[in-house]
């Protein structure tokens, strides 16, 4: 380790710098939190919880006042319309007014328990005015909307978000603004406020402002402020932008979170949300020594910025190359400057609105990507001042590992993966070079060739690769035009590594499971056909499950052209075969319990029917999704039996309001707990009826969520176990550098043969006995119950064959 080569003074300097970084991280995160909070105080989580309890508490009192007013015979005619908003909204609007005018950050740090109401508190008059203004605006808007419904519906085609400003403009345009005198507003607002003052939520204090002048100041009670302050304090660190570490992270322990040096900014080792009032220990998954050792080993991996890639990436970004998915650095060409067609037809105006919305939507996405790239490159520049850095990790409740910072992480996107490599160069070997060539060919979309063919492809293209390294700006063969999972800069990093002349290597070589979720299901159900298609069983060349499903889907469409008007159109568009990319995402996710909605979502997101006119695209998405679902159903028959079994067990256990718990072979105990969510729709729907929903967790389990989530979570827990069991054996072999992303394993090229052997051995270890049987036995023993028998499987299946499968992880 490079850390061990530092002297005591150098170690202290880096540790001190890390402490300063963490203090700055905390300070800037807190400032960012309060800045965001101040933009919409009433939408803060603590304030939402306050509103929830306040509305429940105050609504009966407002209703009592409404009933009393309605019983009277001398009520002014202007009052009844204002009462139409209802008691709950009255309570909500009143408390929101106090939040808006009273709450500041300093309120939570200087609570005066002696005098109660600070002199900086707003007056009852100002709060009353805000209450009445809001209620009147809402009532006027609702009247206008009801009276001019056709106009409102027509404008809604162009206005996606009816903001308060637009609502007021609509009301004014329709001429439905009812005027109220200052006295009427004051009377109404003061009545609303007096009811709230009768509770222990807010309080008032009379202060003298001078000669014969006094004012009633309004604030929340000290106890309410104290509770709000506690909740804000717990949320402040959530706005921190984490970064890598300059010194080794603090190791995780079974009962102690590790990672950053400062305990108050560490993320929980296993993140889990717990119902209010419940003991978190009853809901936490539990790591084993094997998992902890692996997690800490990943954190101890030393990384460095790849300076060659950084130079190219930053040059291209700041010079607006806008290739390889790089966002624009400047936005001079992004303004939607075409003027609105005032004299055009309704169709032309609607088209302009649609194009304008789409253009500015793309601008917003680009602006986000631009901001993120600026942060990424700034962080890379900072880390380049140091020879190496570390990345803390945490776990989810299934045992999967995640970096705390996506930027400059092996779990990040192409930019981040390409910008880093292992910090310490080691001597390259003949086998390491072979794996580097295979890795390079994979990145250049040659991963369906045999290994020898991939090596040959690289050898045949070495002149191109050398030209790329010499001038990557002009020679752009490394640039991909893919919108998603674009590998361009990883290609560039591989080219730089291939052309090294110092005999050393630093680039992580990745080996990806061939649809790892399906690989696990093929082994669990002993499905020979599926095992062959996912390279669990040996073959002379890599098999392609995605293309197989695509071919099945194509055959279904070809054989059933009379069943759908869309099938002939699909066959005309994809003349010879359905591209594998159309089936890839759905096939990849099927092992995790894919729904028909999920298939439609992926078809739409990945643009597989973008060639269809917009007005027809919805139908195309549905029909292509149906065909894909039928294609998958014929391939995944046996895994579907396993998923059905898991869901049946989830249904039975959830009926007893007990969590699903199982232990994987890594020793990790999974607590599969989805609690019912208690939601409250905000009564401040105000103008546009947009629902502001906030929630708390109930101690009761959500049976539907338990049912739906068990299939993906079960498989994810076992792929996590596979990863940590592999890392455990690699540590015994002396390997200390890991670039692992769930089912993509990476290390130095010279160590790949060892890693390849070990990941197969651990897969055999897991599947020698049936994970479904282990799941069943654990639950039966824990709850002293008898569960249904697991589905039958083909026992004439030798799982040790995977040891000979060359393309199991390719």
Give the residues covered by each predicted segment.
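Non-catalytic nucleic-acid-binding interfaces of large nucleic-acid enzymes and RNP effectors
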Residues: 1-587, 593-713, 720, 725, ...
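Short glycine/threonine-rich loop-to-helix capping motif typified by GTGT followed
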Residues: 750-755
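Conserved short loop/turn motifs at secondary-structure junctions
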Residues: 587-589, 605, 742-748
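Ordered, soluble secondary-structure elements with a strong preference for glycine-centered loop motifs
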Residues: 717, 749
